[in-house]
Amino acid sequence: MYSDKVFDHFQNPRNVGKIEDADGVGTVGNPVCGDLMTIYIKVKDNRIEDIKFQTFGCAAAIATSSMATEMAKGKTIEEALKITRDAVAEALGGLPKQKMHCSNLAADALRRAIVDYFRKNGKIDKIKELGLEKELEKMEKGEMDDHGEYCEA
């Protein structure tokens, strides 16, 4: 059963859309259940000034995307990187076990958007400093994250 917050973010998602001139874009997906999320960020003075998402998936996928963008908006890049999968689920009042992969995808899409921002701005040293090299490697190979262990679709 979903919490009232999940229903609210599903029925009234915040920050839906695309930023055409995004400073960073992160896309992740789960081939098991078909969820696909893209998060776009606009950064000014090391702070996420604007953030949007496009998600194709279930109610939990849309709600977690909405919540992750709400949590990240206005935060510094470093603060946004601290937004965890569990924090997204907790902010929504919890998720059923079989939907936890959605919070994983939302947090990972945000992290990928930040890695993309660093890459586009020649800050590869920052990616290494923050231990995000594996994320960059997956992005460069075009790999999607698979959180199938959480998905019972």
Curated annotation (Swiss-Prot):
Positions contributing to [2Fe-2S] cluster binding: 33, 58, 101-102
Keyword Lipid biosynthesis: no
Alphabetical UniProt keywords: 2Fe-2S, Iron, Iron-sulfur, Metal-binding
Classification via InterPro entries: NIF_FeS_clus_asmbl_NifU-like, NIF_FeS_clus_asmbl_NifU_N
GO annotation (BP), single: iron-sulfur cluster assembly
GO molecular function: 2 iron, 2 sulfur cluster binding; iron ion binding
Family statement drawn from the similarity comment of this UniProt entry: Belongs to the NifU family.
Subunit structure: Forms a heterotetramer with IscS2.
Function: A scaffold on which IscS assembles Fe-S clusters. Subsequently gives the nascent cluster to other proteins. Binds 1 2Fe-2S cluster per subunit in a crystal formed under reducing conditions; this subunit provides 3 ligands while IscS2 provides the other ligand. It is likely that Fe-S cluster coordination is flexible as the role of this complex is to build and then hand off Fe-S clusters.
Listed PANTHER family: IRON-SULFUR CLUSTER ASSEMBLY ENZYME NIFU HOMOLOG
Protein name according to UniProt: Iron-sulfur cluster assembly scaffold protein IscU 2
Organism of this sequence: Archaeoglobus fulgidus (strain ATCC 49558 / DSM 4304 / JCM 9628 / NBRC 100126 / VC-16)
Protein encoded by which gene: iscU2
